[in-house]
Amino acid sequence: MERKRARGLDRAVEICDLLARACRPMPPAEIARAIGAPRSSVYELCATMTGLGLLEADAEGMLYPGRKTHFWGRSYLAGFDLAREAQPVLDALTAQTGETSQLCVIDGRKYTVLLMREADRAFRISGDVGEPTPIPWTASGRLLLQHLTDHEILALIPPEDFRQPGGETLSPAQFLLELRAAASEGFFSFDSPSDSYTHCFAAAVTGERGACVATLCLVAPREEARARHAALKASLIQHAARLSERLAGIHGAGSLTA
């Protein structure tokens, strides 16, 4: 009975994770196919999760994360020191630069935006919070893996992720060179390979023992980035250092929960 209950819990977590990553409602049949589980079991489990408020269904029976997961998320962020300390820093960075700022981390074998403060622009130039992205496509990827050896980095990144959005392939050797070069400054920037419009800036946020635990980022139009590169870089590094100091203060008090 305990083993069956554990399998059910594993599948419930898998369903929540699938819906969060898909960023769209899904029918139970599609969920079953995606996680490779029997349809009957998934239908039964989804009904239970809906009754508990973990999932909600629209008029067509499409499922999406329930409001209880929203409340859990708010509670998590309230107690998550990195996110709690980062929000005012993001607000200040965007207010000072006029550009979209982000807090980014590694999630499994991908990069993701954890928090974002969007700039007041007529059109959106940034990605979605929580969307998994291949690490080599990102400026942050050159900073977030610096604590790993070359062998560990290449074992972590799926080989297909070195293929860029435009079809060209970034050599693993070149990626490692860029990563090690960025280490001394704790900063990296480049024109985003995901589109022809944006330039991405990333600065390391360090935690205990100086390890990079996250990155603070700016996303700006390429022309704006070229014209203001030095100023944007300086502001980003300053705010990343400020966030690192805030985290160090929490560590010193012995209360960091993340």
Positions of the model-derived regions?
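Amphipathic alpha-helical effector-binding/dimerization core
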Residues: G61-P159
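Amphipathic alpha-helical regulatory segments at dimerization interfaces
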Residues: L18, A34, E85-Q96, Q102, ...
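Short, structured helix-loop boundary elements
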Residues: R5-L9, G66, G79, A83, ...
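N-terminal helix-turn-helix
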Residues: M1-G79, A83, A241-G249
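Cysteine/selenocysteine-centered motifs that mediate thiol-based redox chemistry or coordinate metal-sulfur cofactors
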Residues: A155-E160, Q164, A240-A258
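Extended hydrophobic
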Residues: E168-R242, G249
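A structural signal for short hydrophobic beta-strand segments in well-ordered beta-sheet cores
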Residues: L55-E56, L103-C104, V205
